[in-house]
């Protein structure tokens, strides 16, 4: 049920906002009083023609009427305005109500919040009700939970059925259809008739009951229909039932008005009040009882003029005050109605909504049909629909802030004269606006609104006049400047005020330009204070942003989509002036790509200092990540080079940076990896630091004879010639004396012993600048200990040689110095750690080199000692080269061991010559002692021992050693040979055992291992042992193998072996272990052979031999093996008959032996070669009865392998052949005819009546042929039944046709022909047309003809009539066009007309006159290149005429023409081409001047040029006095724009436009003029005031330059007072402390007095009294200049009749 209800609801529920159509019709229909019309049933015209959908009823209720409808025919009628705008009508009648139930559809839950303004459409199929005449039928019903005004229903609404308490209680019935009806107006939704308005809204958890009117006796019954989401009142749609879209007068609509009784929503008396049309004048009257519980109050069509008393309705949600006498203001009492959602104020006399308070829940407001001049009111935060049609609204000024407004209606207001009003409304309301004046927003208007600057909405609300978008930026700025100019500091003007386009997390800067207008500057400095604010819309309240008080603001993420406002407050001398502001466009979402706004480098660019880079990054919506920084160094004339490791924001300048410019590179990176553009920042060149030195020290031992070195850490650019000094302190005087200079090294002498040595370091840079000297002192210099010099090693550096260390000892007399020897693998001494001891420390200085020192360097540690035991520093002496070794050699070589097979020989030798490496060992065989070098024994190579093998028996054995040193040096080889030959060993058996399966039929082998020389004829014997262990030799078994037989079953087998050497020496006999018992063998087929011929048709059998116990039932299978390996089992018989399927295949026999106990042996198989085929032969050949054109398939049987392509010959013979004549038919004469050489044959007409013979030679697939087989038919070939096919009509000429067909069925006789005519599916025989040809007559036009063919055989057998397919419709000739010609000239603007030239033939003249239909045209244009080969179609140009346009100039035009006749056919394409189009004569069309008509406005000339491409056309602006034909040229004004000035006042501006084509051709000049130029209103007002006073003074600056033609400068201006009255004018020099005021220029307004202005300087004017008295004046602004000029001319006009033309002089 809910699904059906939802469907009904979906089709019926729509908003009342879309229902707004036309206010006149709506007001008239809605305003009719429901009490004045009898209730009748209504059926919608649209609903009547639409299939009704089922209506589901749930919890039915039975409402009752609260009062009866009483209308007296004699009751006096008070004439007053009601909701229809007219007077009430007198209707007499009585209505009855039949007791019926109310059926309504329960609304399904709608998750989308819907309020009344959002409902779009609804439909009522039929409503019927009757009114009860009894007044006292009020009764409360069960509560219905509804949610008034709510936009989201959380529960579906149901209605409970209430049974009537008495049988006399009537009821009303309403049926609701799902048919859609056109929607009604929103503007007058507050003025709907009381019985049709859906005032009740569904409430959750509330009780709604029927309300009885307090004046039941005189007023009609009050009820309302049910609104379930979107049911609209049938009365609201009265015009819908008669065609909603039609418009008519109110009277005509009234005649169709049908009033329905209202259906009561079960609203309780305490929640609902309906007093419509009760002439109530005050809400505080005694008879009106307003309750705080009321939620639905309907007070329309009364006489209320004040809202006093309405404040008690603090819970009201729907308030209808339409069609009363409210004039406003006085809406303050509504402030207490916080729950109000819908307010209807239509049809009153309201002039202003300024007093309407802010209603936090108001969603719908109707103020249509009032006298509002503007929509100024308090902000309504939830208002969605504002209906303000039929008012007097003229301006958008003070438009309220409506943040969620969706629908705005302002039809029939003067405001509609504003161009692009819809775009202005979009700007004021914002993106929530969906509909304007009952239409969806126009895309064009939305696009136009986007072109306006951000401050447009604010300016509109402040009263700015809406203008074109391209002028809006300048116009709104001027508007704001005009508002601000009086609040700015004195002398300051605003030059600019705008904000950059804001983007997320990117700097947004404001631009305010204030400059001084006055030339005299003040000493006070102007400062600007800033404050940024943010708001959702430009008209909403801006909220200041905390700490956003700078010129630049960085929008945050929460600012996206919002509007920024920057307020700039001028401050001068601690005085704050009113702020000015600028509005931004909505904040855009950042692109996520960061960018660097600025880079700064801090730090002094001096060597050793730290500089730091700081970046200001706009992250543009990205999350800051780890950015990439790097430092680069750039030389003066080089490119930047990256500094390795310098990747931090801080960098310490080093020596390498001196003279270079540092480059800081910064690349912003977000966390997501998005990189911005890298930015660079260059520094100045780095300077070197002043020279200095630190960490000065002395290295070396302070001992006599040692060398001291002074060192220090230099800093300060590149080091230059620094100075060094060595000083020694005098022991007696303590003074320092210079002992060395210019070097950093000093060798201590005997004089230095016991003193301190001082080292002085004076740093100097490369430029010679010296720094502060730094000094340091050494420790006390000590005397030198004993020391060895010139130490060296003497002797031969070879293995086992003696060497000696020598040296000179200083530092006293040498005592028992000690020497210790080492070896070292390095040729350079690197300390004690790399030395390896060879001896202990001894006094002896000689040493014999051991073997371990070979390859090493010899090191001697020489420790000098004095006789008193003082030791000096040891000295290490390294030999010049490494110790060499002797060449490798052997000092002895021998072989020990027994020379017998199996014996082991061992070789030993003595090696000398350094460390032995991998010496080489080899053993050799020698047949004799002189057999050298012998045969190498490979397996013994590299071994010192050799085990003699059998191969060495009888041979000598030798051993050879090749000494090899560890360095790879090879010595001389040396050999040693055994003294005797190798003897063989005694024969013996190493191992013996029986090998093989102990099964009958298996071959056993004796596996043995012999040793003892070469084996001879050893002896084997086999033994059989029974179960009691008694062995028995097996006779004849004397070999190494034995085949088990049946006799061995159950016994054990063993073998004996007696080894015999080849020299017949015998060894002991060995017996193997017994093996057994022997078991019976597995059944086996030892042989298998085929018997028989392997040819197709032969029988194949086999012969098999069996072993393995007693034979049982053996298995066998015959298998066919195909060439592809696939096997097919054929049979299991003892034989196989070969067939055709076996030919070429192999036959395999599988034989499985089976023992009698059922044990199966291994299958054995044999296979044949391919089975050969038999000789080919034909076994059978038959020919069935033959008939013409019926294929004959003979029946044949072949044998002899696979049949190949045999030879078939069909013969035709008139007589039947027999015997040899038949078998030898191939030799027959001409009476026999060969017909075919295929197996199958189809008899033809020639074969009818003859016999057919088939000659067949059977052929095998390999080409071998058999004997031929011949057969003849039993009877002659019979003819076929007569028939005809392919019956068709062939067109001979345009008016002649021929019938054709293909006859079949024996020989044709006199066949019959006929012709038919087909028209609209009816086929009629054409009389007299019985031949094969037919000539078309006029009766055949637009018809089709058919040809009929009845076949007749020669024997008079008649066949079936066959008809051809209908021809195409017989039509006359297609219209032809001889040629296509043009009328008109190929000139821009001219009209070309295509005309056809008709052929003069009679038939074509007839066709064109009688059968011509439409003619289609298509125009084409060639490309710009002028290529006539290709054209582009002009899709819209499809008429015979074409007006040549501008874009056609220089191109060729082509027109294609196709003529269609009345039969739908088309002629061949005809076309005509033009020459290249020439441009038209230049002219200007629709010339006009645009401008607002004041002397301060900008005027522009507009017109449409015609005549090719416009060249340098001439424009001249002129003035014209009203009523005078004279024109005064304005010099220099030849542009399309003209800025008017004060000299134009009272004149018409005239522009003369002379069009000139680009090739110089000049057209006729055209002029346009304006209305007389008026004074700008503000200036006019000011001038009138001054003229009325009669005495005016101005403070001006006077130009005292003696050369007035020069440009006025600021330095030659002096202050003067300009005084004027109605009679005279004078220029007065003000007085000072030293002088009185003096009059410099005085004069009256008589001729030649005049005032001149200067177009190049709008602040300057010249007053000319006469030829000798004139003065140049400079004022502060153009405005003041214009006021002065107009005031002077105003005074002058009274006394001077001179035409103003002589007064308007312009400086050129």
Curated annotation (Swiss-Prot):
Disruption phenotype: No visible phenotype.
PROSITE patterns in alphabetical order: LRR
Bias-annotated ranges (Low complexity): 122-134, 173-234
Biased composition range(s): Polar residues: 67-93, 149-165
Tissue: Strongly expressed in dividing cells, like the meristemic region of the root tip.
Subunit-level organization: Interacts with KCBP.
Protein name in the entry: 187-kDa microtubule-associated protein AIR9
Annotated source species: Arabidopsis thaliana
């Amino acid at each position: 049920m809910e699904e059906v209800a939802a469907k009904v609801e979906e089709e019926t529920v729509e908003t009342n906002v879309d229902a707004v159509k036309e206010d006149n019709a709506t007001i008239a229909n809605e305003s009719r009083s429901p009490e004045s019309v009898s209730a009748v049933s209504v059926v919608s015209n649209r609903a009547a023609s639409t299939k009704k959908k089922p209506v589901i009823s749930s919890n039915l209720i039975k409402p009752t009427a609260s009062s009866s409808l009483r209308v007296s025919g004699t009751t006096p009628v008070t004439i007053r305005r009601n909701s229809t705008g007219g007077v009430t009508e007198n209707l007499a009648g009585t209505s009855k109500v039949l007791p019926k139930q109310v059926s309504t559809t329960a609304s399904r839950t709608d998750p989308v919040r819907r309020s009344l303004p959002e409902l779009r459409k609804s439909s009522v199929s039929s409503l019927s009700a009757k009114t009860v005449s009894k007044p006292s039928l009020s009764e409360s019903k069960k509560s219905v939970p509804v949610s008034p005004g709510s936009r989201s229903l959380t529960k579906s609404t149901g209605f409970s059925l209430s049974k009537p308490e008495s049988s006399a209680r009537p009821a009303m019935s309403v049926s609701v259809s799902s048919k859609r009806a056109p929607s009604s107006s929103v503007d007058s939704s507050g003025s709907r008739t009381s019985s049709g308005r859906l005032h009740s809204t569904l409430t959750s958890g509330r009780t709604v009951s029927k309300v009885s009117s307090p004046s039941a006796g005189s007023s009609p019954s009050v009820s309302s229909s049910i609104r379930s989401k979107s049911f609209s009142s049938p009365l609201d749609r009265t015009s819908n039932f008669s065609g909603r879209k039609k418009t008519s007068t109110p009277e005509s609509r009234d005649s169709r008005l049908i009033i329905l009784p209202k259906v009561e929503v079960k609203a309780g008396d305490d929640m609902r009040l309906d007093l419509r049309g009760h002439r109530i004048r005050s809400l505080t009257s005694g008879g009106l009882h307003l309750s705080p519980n009321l939620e639905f109050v309907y007070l329309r069509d009364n006489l209320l003029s004040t809202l006093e008393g309405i404040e008690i309705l603090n819970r009201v949600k729907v308030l209808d005050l339409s069609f009363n006498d409210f004039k406003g203001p006085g809406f303050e009492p509504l402030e207490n109605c916080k729950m109000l959602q819908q307010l209807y104020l239509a049809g009153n006399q309201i002039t202003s909504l300024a007093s309407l308070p802010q209603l936090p829940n108001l969603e719908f407001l109707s103020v249509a049909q009032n006298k509002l001049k503007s929509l100024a009111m308090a902000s309504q935060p939830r208002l969605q629909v504002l209906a303000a049609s039929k008012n007097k609204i003229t301006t958008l000024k003070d438009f309220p802030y409506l943040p969620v407004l969706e629908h705005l209606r302002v039809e029939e207001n003067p405001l509609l004269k504003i161009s692009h009003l819809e775009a202005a409304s979009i700007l004021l309301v914002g993106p929530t606006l969906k509909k304007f004046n009952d239409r969806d927003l126009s895309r064009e208007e939305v696009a136009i609104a986007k072109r306006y600057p951000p401050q447009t909405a604010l300016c509109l609300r402040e009263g700015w006049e809406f203008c074109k978008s391209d002028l809006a930026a300048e116009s709104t700025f001027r508007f704001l400047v005009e508002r601000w100019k009086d609040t700015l500091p004195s002398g300051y003007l605003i030059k600019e005020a705008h904000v950059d386009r804001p983007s997320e997390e990117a700097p947004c800067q404001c631009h305010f330009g204030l400059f001084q207008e006055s030339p005299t500057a003040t000493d006070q400095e102007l400062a600007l204070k800033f404050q940024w604010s943010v708001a959702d819309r430009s008209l909403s309240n801006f909220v200041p942003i905390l700490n956003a008080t700078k010129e630049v603001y960085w929008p945050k993420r929460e600012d996206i989509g919002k509007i920024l406002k920057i307020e700039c407050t001028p401050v001068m001398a601690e005085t704050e002036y009113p702020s000015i502001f600028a509005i931004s466009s909505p904040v855009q979402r950042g692109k996520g790509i960061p960018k660097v706004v600025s880079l700064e480098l801090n730090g002094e660019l001096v060597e050793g200092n730290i500089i730091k880079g700081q970046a200001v990054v706009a992250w543009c919506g990205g999350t800051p990540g780890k950015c990439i920084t790097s430092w680069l160094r750039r030389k003066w004339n080089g490119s930047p080079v990256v500094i390795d490791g310098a990747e931090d924001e801080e960098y310490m300048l080093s020596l390498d940076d001196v003279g270079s410019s540092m480059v800081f590179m910064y690349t912003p990176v977000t966390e997501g990896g998005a990189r911005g553009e890298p930015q660079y920042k260059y520094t100045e060149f780095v300077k070197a630091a002043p020279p200095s030195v630190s960490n000065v020290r002395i290295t070396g031992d302070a001992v006599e004879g040692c060398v001291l070195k002074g060192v220090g850490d230099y800093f300060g650019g590149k080091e230059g010639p620094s100075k060094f000094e060595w000083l020694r302190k005098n022991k007696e005087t303590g003074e320092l004396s210079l002992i060395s200079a210019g070097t950093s090294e000093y060798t201590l002498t005997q004089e230095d012993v016991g003193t301190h040595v001082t080292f002085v370091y004076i740093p100097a840079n490369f430029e010679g600048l010296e720094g502060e000297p730094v000094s340091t002192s050494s420790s006390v210099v000590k005397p030198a200990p004993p020391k060895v010099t010139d130490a060296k090693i003497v002797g031969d550096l070879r293995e086992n040689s003696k060497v000696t260390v020598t040296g000179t000892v200083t530092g006293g007399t040498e005592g028992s110095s000690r020497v210790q020897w080492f070896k070292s693998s390095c040729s350079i001494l690197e300390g004690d750690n790399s030395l390896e001891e060879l001896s202990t420390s001894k006094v002896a200085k000689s040493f014999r080199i051991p073997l371990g020192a070979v390859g090493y360097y010899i090191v001697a540690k020489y420790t000098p000692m004095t006789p008193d035991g003082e030791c000096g520093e040891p000295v290490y002496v390294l030999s010049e080269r490494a110790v060499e070794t002797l060449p490798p050699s052997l000092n002895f070589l021998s072989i020990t061991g027994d020379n017998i097979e199996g014996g082991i020989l061992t070789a030993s030798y003595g090696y000398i010559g350094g460390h032995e490496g991998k010496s080489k060992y080899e053993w050799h065989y020698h047949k004799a002692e002189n057999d050298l070098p012998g045969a190498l024994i490979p397996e013994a190579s590299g071994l010192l021992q050799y085990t003699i093998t059998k191969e060495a028996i009888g041979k000598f054995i030798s051993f050879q050693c090749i000494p090899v040193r560890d360095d790879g040096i090879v010595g001389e080889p040396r050999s040693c040979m055994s003294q005797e030959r190798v003897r063989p060993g005694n024969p013996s058996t190493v191992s013996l055992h029986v090998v093989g399966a102990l099964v009958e039929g298996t071959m056993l082998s004796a596996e043995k291992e012999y040793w003892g020389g070469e084996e001879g004829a050893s002896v084997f014997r086999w033994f059989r042992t029974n179960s009691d262990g008694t062995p028995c030799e097996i006779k004849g078994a004397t070999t190494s193998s034995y085949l088990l037989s049946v006799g061995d079953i159950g016994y054990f087998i063993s073998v004996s072996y007696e080894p015999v050497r080849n020299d017949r020496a015998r060894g002991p006999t060995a017996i193997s272990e017994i093996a057994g018992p022997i078991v019976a063998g597995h059944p086996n087929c030892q042989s298998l052979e085929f018997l028989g011929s392997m040819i197709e048709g032969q029988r194949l059998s086999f012969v098999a031999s069996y072993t393995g116990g007693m034979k049982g039932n053996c298995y066998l299978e015959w298998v066919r093996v195909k060439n592809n390996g696939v096997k097919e089992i054929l049979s299991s018989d003892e034989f196989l008959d070969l067939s055709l399927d076996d030919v070429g295949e192999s036959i395999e026999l599988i034989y499985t032996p089976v023992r009698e106990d059922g044990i199966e042996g291994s299958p054995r198989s044999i296979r044949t070669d391919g089975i050969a085929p038999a000789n080919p032969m034909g076994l059978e050949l038959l020919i069935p009865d033959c008939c013409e054109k019926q294929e004959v398939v003979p029946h044949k049987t072949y044998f002899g392998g696979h049949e190949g392509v045999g030879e078939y010959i069909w013969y035709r013979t008139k007589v039947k052949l027999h015997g040899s004549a038949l078998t030898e038919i191939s030799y027959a004469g001409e009476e026999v005819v060969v017909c075919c050489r295929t197996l199958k044959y189809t008899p033809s007409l020639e074969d009818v009546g003859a016999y057919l013979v088939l000659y067949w030679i059977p052929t095998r697939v390999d080409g071998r042929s058999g004997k031929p087989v011949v057969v003849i038919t039993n009877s002659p070939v019979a003819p076929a039944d007569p028939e005809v096919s392919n019956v068709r009509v062939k067109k001979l000429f345009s008016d002649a046709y021929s019938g054709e067909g293909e006859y079949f069925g024996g020989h044709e006789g006199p066949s019959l022909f006929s012709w038919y005519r087909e028209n609209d599916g009816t086929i009629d025989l054409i009389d007299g047309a019985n031949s094969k040809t037919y000539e078309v007559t006029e009766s055949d036009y637009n018809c089709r003809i058919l040809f009929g063919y009845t076949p007749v055989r020669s024997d008079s057998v008649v066949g079936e009539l066959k008809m051809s397919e209908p021809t195409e419709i017989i039509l006359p000739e297609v219209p032809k066009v001889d040629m296509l010609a043009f009328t008109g000239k190929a000139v821009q603007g001219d009209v070309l007309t295509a005309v056809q030239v008709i052929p003069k033939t009679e038939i074509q003249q007839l066709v064109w006159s009688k059968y011509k239909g439409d003619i289609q045209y298509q125009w084409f244009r060639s490309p710009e290149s002028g290529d006539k080969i290709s054209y582009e179609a002009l899709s819209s140009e499809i008429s015979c005429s074409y007006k040549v346009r501008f874009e056609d100039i220089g191109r060729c035009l082509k027109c294609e023409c196709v003529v269609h006749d009345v039969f739908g056919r088309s002629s061949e394409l005809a076309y005509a081409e033009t020459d290249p189009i020439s441009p038209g004569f230049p002219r200007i069309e629709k010339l006009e001047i645009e401008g607002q008509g004041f002397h301060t406005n900008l005027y522009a000339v507009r017109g449409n040029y015609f005549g090719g491409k416009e060249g340098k056309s001439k424009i001249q602006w002129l003035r014209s006095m009203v009523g005078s034909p004279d024109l005064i040229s304005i010099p220099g004004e030849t542009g399309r724009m003209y800025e008017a000035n004060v000299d134009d006042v009272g004149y018409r501006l005239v522009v003369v436009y002379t069009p000139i084509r680009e090739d110089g051709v000049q057209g006729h000049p055209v002029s346009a003029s304006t209305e007389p130029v008026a004074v700008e209103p503000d200036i006019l007002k000011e001038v009138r005031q001054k003229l009325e006073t009669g005495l005016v003074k101005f403070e001006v600056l006077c130009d005292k330059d003696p050369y007035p033609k020069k440009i006025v400068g600021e330095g030659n201006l002096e202050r003067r007072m300009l005084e004027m009255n109605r009679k005279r004018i004078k220029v007065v020099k003000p007085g000072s402390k030293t002088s009185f005021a003096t009059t410099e220029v005085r004069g009256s307004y008589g001729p030649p007095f005049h005032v001149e202005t200067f177009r190049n300087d709008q602040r300057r004017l010249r007053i000319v009294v006469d030829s000798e008295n004139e003065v140049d004046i400079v004022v502060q602004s153009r405005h003041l200049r214009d006021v002065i000029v107009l005031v002077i001319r105003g005074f002058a006009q009274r006394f001077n009749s001179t035409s103003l033309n002589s007064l308007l002089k312009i400086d050129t």
